[in-house]
């Protein structure tokens, strides 16, 4: 988190760091907007509007892939604009996985692991995150696209919200700053502390999701930062 690194953790920073500190002071830090439900289910869901015969002919298991349940583009934009108001779409965007389909070692032969990620679920949700009422609503929304019985198949479940990401993983406002640029941004090097991992402060290097190549490419940022340090 470059914000905390430069604005909170540095004590008596050298004059050489003034420019980068001023830059990050002017850079907004957004709040988290992702929540994740993990559940143990006793029966696999069956989608209502999927032609199973089509997948069987091609040897594909539709439950092995990530299912994206997305509202319209206009609604997605609306969901983004609702974040500052602490509101959530009636039909939030959902990402659904059953990891135990791909990894049978995660199941006891009768139960499966079910994962549902909901987007545009703000840290500052106006109803608060102390209740499971809102996450339960996402499960109900998912249940609308599968055959009856899904809710009854849920044996145990938990939800990790942006509030949990802050308290359990120390992410300010439940948000992990992620590098928003791509390879071109790295080549242009307009933010060397993020793309080259070096800072104006001797001995201080950055790594993590905020640095190139960003979240989702596990370990790449740390490896690049380590190479940079060892090359000194």
Positions of PLM-derived features:
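Flavin-binding catalytic cores
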Residues: 44-45, 60, 73-91, 128-169
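A glycine- and small-residue-enriched flexible loop/hinge segment at structural boundaries
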Residues: 118-125
